[in-house]
Each structure stands twice: as structure tokens, then as C-alpha cells.
Curated annotation (Swiss-Prot):
Function summary: Catalyzes the reductive methylation of 2'-deoxyuridine-5'-monophosphate (dUMP) to 2'-deoxythymidine-5'-monophosphate (dTMP) while utilizing 5,10-methylenetetrahydrofolate (mTHF) as the methyl donor, and NADPH and FADH(2) as the reductant.
The protein, known as: Flavin-dependent thymidylate synthase
Quaternary structure, from the entry: Homotetramer.
Residues annotated as domain ThyX: 43-257
Annotated FAD binding sites: T89, R112, H113, R114, E120, D212, L213, H214, H218
GN (gene name): thyX
Active site: R223 (involved in ionization of n3 of dump, leading to its activation)
Species whose genome carries this gene: Ruegeria pomeroyi (strain ATCC 700808 / DSM 15171 / DSS-3) (Silicibacter pomeroyi)
Length: 302
């Protein structure tokens, strides 16, 4: 995570500034404000601002005038009830603003979550840095034989080295040509908005991303899942740690009822009940497709 001395000084200056407030403050999140949490080889996640805490969720749910009830146990129980029964608007009262540095191909997955406010670094106005995501050897993998969207076994030895060399060489060559097209001093050069088209998808971009807690939980449920692509999953895992410090009751409920939970179809529930009753249920008698049956077996640990 190469932050320049100027960037580090700016972060230190931001963290040194304090101000009196009547706003709700989350002590756990205050410790993360402005700090860069490294992700991948050049990326990071920074908390720029936040609004609300666990008590704000309860306040919204009760439409109360003050803080939630004085009983911490009651607040935690209410939050777990709201999460368990799929309530959304109380969680939307909390918001988080992040500064994220990430590869472009990760950003294209991320931006599919359309329930956030985003402002991205503009390559029309500025020249992008020479920073590319190059996966570690253990993450250079073949295509999965059973999942069109996933990876299989990691490539080994010379094959992995060959792929990594191609990635590094292509990235360097594309950036060299990008610089050459923009032009040197005394040359007119190509417009930045056109020169950027030649850059590869593993170059890093940056954005500010603001989202409410309900939609953030939806993002994390999908992107922190073991089936998510590694490169976006590590960002989601970093964000999970931040959210756990920000709203610990809400995050624990999210872990229990979303992240660590599973959804079973009506046929799966019926099959499970029959199994518990002692019946030998097979894929053919379950009413499930082969893929559904395989997923069901994974859930029940068979």
C-alpha cells in the first residue's frame, strides 16, 4: 500500500483534528477514522465519515425522541429481531462514507451495487498512477471445471510464472504507451480522456463510496461470501471488521442471520424434515435438481 509522505502527513493531520459535537459518536469507529487499511498489493479502505450507531437503529425503530431504551440487552434484542425479520429502514438510518483504492476490474463488480453514492477519480482530468494489481502466485488459478464464474486449482511452477510475467509485461507496456500518447513536454499529445482507453483493467482507481447500513450489509453478504471473487472479497472482509467496531450489535446480528446463515427452498426444508424422520432421501426423490442437491448436501454437511 504505497502511500506517499504527503498522503501520510494529510492523514495524520486529519486524525489530529478534533471537534466538540452533539452527534452520536461510535468509539469503535472513531479509532478507524481516516486510517488507511491495506488491501491487495496497492489498495486500501479508509473511513472518511459515518452517521449513527446501534442506538440510532433502535431509535429509528421506536420512532423515539431520545436514545434507545436504557437497557443494552433490550437494544440488542430489538436489533436481532429487526435483522431476523428482514426489516430494512431502521438500518438505513446509519451511513458510512469510505475512500477506497481498488483495481478497475474490482470496481466494475463493486459498482453493480447501485444503492450507494459514488464519486470516482477521473482519468479525464488526471493522469493515473503506474500501479497495477498483480496477484500473488497462490491466487493465479485455472478456470473452475464446475463453476463458470469461479477458479479451480492454482497454477503451479512454470505455468504460474509464465502467466505472471505476461501480466507484468502487458501492464508495463500499456502504461508506457499511455504516457507516450499523452505526450511529452513540447508535444500536443492525445487527450487524457482518449489515452486512458488503452489501460488494462488491473490498473488502480480510487473513489469515495457512501452507503447506508442496510445496503452495506447486502453488499457484505454477497461479497464477503466464500464464493465471491477473492479480489473483491478481501475488501469486503476489511469492511466487515470496520462495521463490527462501528455497530457491534447490528454486525453480530448480521453475522448470525445473514453472513453465517443459509436459505433453504421449500423442497430442501421438506427433504430435511423427511431425513430427520428417518427416511432415506435421494436426489431423485427430493424434487431437487442435481446442482440444488449438491448445494443442499453442502449445507447439511453430507
Amino acid at each position: 500500500m504505497p502511500l506517499s509522505s504527503e498522503q501520510l502527513a494529510e492523514i495524520d493531520a486529519q486524525r489530529a483534528h478534533t471537534a466538540p459535537t452533539r452527534r452520536v459518536v461510535s468509539p469503535g469507529m472513531e479509532s478507524h477514522l481516516y486510517r488507511a487499511h491495506p488491501v491487495l498489493d496497492h489498495g486500501f479502505v479508509r473511513v472518511i465519515d459515518y452517521m449513527g450507531d446501534d442506538a440510532a437503529i433502535c431509535q429509528a425503530a421506536r420512532v423515539s425522541y431520545g436514545t434507545g431504551t436504557k437497557s443494552v440487552q433490550n437494544d440488542e434484542g430489538l436489533i436481532r429481531y429487526l435483522m431476523r425479520h428482514w426489516h430494512s429502514t431502521p438500518f438505513e438510518m446509519c451511513e458510512l462514507k469510505l475512500h477506497v483504492k481498488l483495481p478497475v476490474f474490482v470496481a466494475r463488480q463493486w459498482i453493480r451495487h447501485r444503492t450507494a453514492n459514488v464519486n470516482e477519480y477521473s482519468a479525464r482530468y488526471s493522469i493515473l498512477d503506474r500501479e497495477f494489481y498483480i496477484p500473488a502466485p497462490e491466487h493465479v488459478a485455472a478456470q473452475s471445471a464446475v463453476n463458470n464464474q469461479g477458479r479451480g486449482e492454482a497454477l503451479q511452477g512454470e505455468e504460474a510464472a509464465r502467466v505472471l510475467e505476461i501480466l507484468k509485461a502487458d501492464s508495463a507496456r500499456c502504461y508506457d504507451n499511455y504516457e507516450a500518447m499523452i505526450g511529452q513536454e513540447g508535444q500536443q499529445g492525445l487527450a487524457r480522456e482518449l489515452a486512458r482507453m488503452n489501460l488494462p483493467a488491473n490498473i488502480y482507481t480510487q473513489w469515495y463510496w457512501k452507503v447506508d447500513l442496510h445496503n452495506l450489509f447486502h453488499f457484505l453478504r454477497l461479497r464477503a461470501d466464500a464464493h465471491a471473487q477473492y479480489e473483491i472479497r478481501v475488501y469486503a472482509e476489511t469492511m466487515c471488521r470496520l462495521v463490527a467496531d462501528w455497530v457491534p450489535f447490528a454486525y453480530k446480528a448480521f453475522e448470525d442471520y445473514r453472513l453465517g446463515a443459509v436459505n433453504l427452498s421449500a423442497q430442501m426444508v421438506d427433504s430435511l424434515r423427511r431425513m430427520l424422520a428417518g427416511e432415506a432421501v435421494t436426489q431423485e426423490t427430493s424434487g431437487l435438481s442435481a446442482r440444488e442437491w449438491r448445494e443442499f448436501q453442502d449445507v447439511i454437511g453430507r
